[in-house]
Amino acid sequence: SSSGLISMPRV
């Protein structure tokens, strides 16, 4: 999930 400015791809 994307948190603020940082988007973490769920793999």
UniProtKB/Swiss-Prot annotation:
The modification Valine amide is found at residue 11. The keyword Methyltransferase does not apply. GO terms for biological process: neuropeptide signaling pathway. Keywords: Amidation, Neuropeptide, Secreted. It is found in: Secreted. Its main location: secreted. It holds the Pfam family Periviscerokin. InterPro entries: Periviscerokinin (IPR013231). GO terms for cellular component: extracellular region. It comes from the Eukaryota. Mediates visceral muscle contractile activity (myotropic activity). Belongs to the periviscerokinin family. This is Periviscerokinin-3. It comes from Mastotermes darwiniensis.
